[in-house]
């Protein structure tokens, strides 16, 4: 059993491979499974709105765009305080937590403004005070390495002129010492103190810089990923559907772990019959988790989304087209994600797979 569950590593790429140097090990980590630091609420004034905007409440997305260039802002927990007449329209005075979700390039002098809720366009209005504006990034809480040996080695990799791709990472290990996850990390040491876990061990607090990437394209694992990692620490799962209780972030984390644990196949199976357990396929992530387990077993990898599935169907991932796939309880996916299921079915049939969709009797 591996006592140290994390490794701090320097890495760089060569023409042929990736070189990894383990510089320190830690028994545990605190602050890794986190969302960005919440942003402060602020006043939001939407100018020239349809009158029905007076009744807005909840979470929204604001798009400020010129042609194909846009900024998307999340307006979280928006509360309307009142309205002011503006010709035939109204100005809406509200409060919300405002955070950039995505950004395009430079803007022209007269951007248009659209408001959305759950991808549904609610309407266009004339402007939002202070938007578009620069964004300085998502703030992240510090990460603490617990029980570190050799804390003096926890420092950023020195930049070398001949290295074009390099960096620092945190590797999570399972109980057998296999690297099961890799997370980019900044090694900006804020403090080092003796650890209560034993003599010669230290707790190291690492400040983390802001990131401009939206949280949905996170490098950091989501809070719900912790339970997924805990399960995988015992080794690659040997049972199907252990991912089913997890939310979307947890299922995403599960798919990420399958990719790093993917097997190397010397040859592919051709022909045969496989069954998808479709009872828990309620979103596109779970579709791929269930399909992967059907084709290459629990914890197996055969793509995390439809483009990766298309690549796997070319061969080299354990199973090649020419087989029969029986999809049990297909109505679950048919009700939840009909369009995505249809794309997957069409792709597999185009590749010569005999696919039979079965509904629960």
Stretches with model-predicted labels:
Residues 272-274, 321-328, 353-356:
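Hydrophobic beta-strand segments of well-ordered beta-sheets in folded domains
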Residues 1-233, 237-240:
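Phosphate/adenylate-binding glycine loop and adjacent helical scaffold
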Residues 2-28, 32, 232-300:
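Extended, compositionally biased accessory segments flanking or bridging domains
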Residues 333-361:
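Helix-rich interaction surfaces within compact, conserved domain-sized segments
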Residues 49, 54-57, 65-68, 74, ...:
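Conserved helix-adjacent loop modules within structured domains
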Residues 252-255, 302-307, 334-336:
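A short linear-motif detector with a strong N-terminal bias
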């Amino acid at each position: 059993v591996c006592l140290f569950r994390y490794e701090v590593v320097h890495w760089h790429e060569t023409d042929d491979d990736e070189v990894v140097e383990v510089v320190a090990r830690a028994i545990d980590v605190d602050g890794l499974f986190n969302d960005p630091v919440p942003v402060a609420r602020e006043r939001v004034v939407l100018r020239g709105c349809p009158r029905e905007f007076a009744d807005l409440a909840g979470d929204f997305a604001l798009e400020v765009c010129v042609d194909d260039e846009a900024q998307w802002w999340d307006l979280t927990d928006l509360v309307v305080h009142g309205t002011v007449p503006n010709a035939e329209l109204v100005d809406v005075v509200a409060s919300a937590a405002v955070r950039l979700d995505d950004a395009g390039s430079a803007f022209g002098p007269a951007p248009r403004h659209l408001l959305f809720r759950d991808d549904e366009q609610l309407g266009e209005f004339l402007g939002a005070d202070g938007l578009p504006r620069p964004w300085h990034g998502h703030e992240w809480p510090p990460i603490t390495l617990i029980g570190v040996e050799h804390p003096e080695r926890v420092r950023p990799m020195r930049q070398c002129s001949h290295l074009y791709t390099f960096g620092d990472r945190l590797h999570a290990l399972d109980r057998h010492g296999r690297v099961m996850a890799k997370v980019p990390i900044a090694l900006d040491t804020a403090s080092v103190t003796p650890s209560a876990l034993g003599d010669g061990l230290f707790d190291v607090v690492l400040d983390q810089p802001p990131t401009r990437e939206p949280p949905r394209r996170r490098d950091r694992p989501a809070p719900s990923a912790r339970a997924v990692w805990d399960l995988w620490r015992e080794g690659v799962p040997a049972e199907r559907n252990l991912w089913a209780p997890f939310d979307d972030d947890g299922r995403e984390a599960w798919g990420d772990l399958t990719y790093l644990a993917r097997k190397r196949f010397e040859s592919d199976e051709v022909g045969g019959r496989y069954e998808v357990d479709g009872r828990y396929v309620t979103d596109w992530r779970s579709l791929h988790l269930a399909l992967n387990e059907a084709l290459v077993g629990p914890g197996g990898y055969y793509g995390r989304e439809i483009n990766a599935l298309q690549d796997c169907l070319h061969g080299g991932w354990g199973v090649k087209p020419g087989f029969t796939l029986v999809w049990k309880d297909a109505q679950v996916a048919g009700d939840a994600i009909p369009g995505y299921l249809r794309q997957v079915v069409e792709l597999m049939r185009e590749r010569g797979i005999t696919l039979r969709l079965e509904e629960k009797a």
